[in-house]
Amino acid sequence: MAQQSPYSAAMAEQRHQEWLRFVDLLKNAYQNDLHLPLLNLMLTPDEREALGTRVRIVEELLRGEMSQRELKNELGAGIATITRGSNSLKAAPVELRQWLEEVLLKDH
């Protein structure tokens, strides 16, 4: 098995640090009630739509009333996107999953 080159590891670390910087920026934007303008600046309309679809995928997977194929037809998302969402949800920490259930399913 080939090892990752130090350059690749360094690039991965840089990307991770950039992600954490964005998360900190978003946290600060929430504290200053600037989160919507920031997200509108940083995300294209397609990216915002994709995030909304992913929230719906997670919500419906948590609800457990539809098959992945039904979700695909209902949401117009690709089956691979739904499968990734399902796998990510299975791998998510228990605390996150419980929180998502409370937040996303509270009115349903």
Swiss-Prot record:
Primary location class: cytoplasm
Sorted UniProt keywords: Cytoplasm, DNA-binding, Repressor, Transcription, Transcription regulation
Record-annotated DNA-binding residue ranges: 68-91
Places the protein is found: Cytoplasm
Gene Ontology CC, one term: cytoplasm
InterPro entries cross-referenced by the UniProt entry: Trp_repress, Trp_repress_bac, Trp_repressor/repl_initiator, TrpR-like_sf
Molecular function in Gene Ontology: DNA-binding transcription factor activity; sequence-specific DNA binding
Biological process, per Gene Ontology: negative regulation of DNA-templated transcription
Homology family: Belongs to the TrpR family.
Function: This protein is an aporepressor. When complexed with L-tryptophan it binds the operator region of the trp operon (5'-ACTAGT-'3') and prevents the initiation of transcription. The complex also regulates trp repressor biosynthesis by binding to its regulatory region.
Subunit and partners: Homodimer.
Protein name: Trp operon repressor
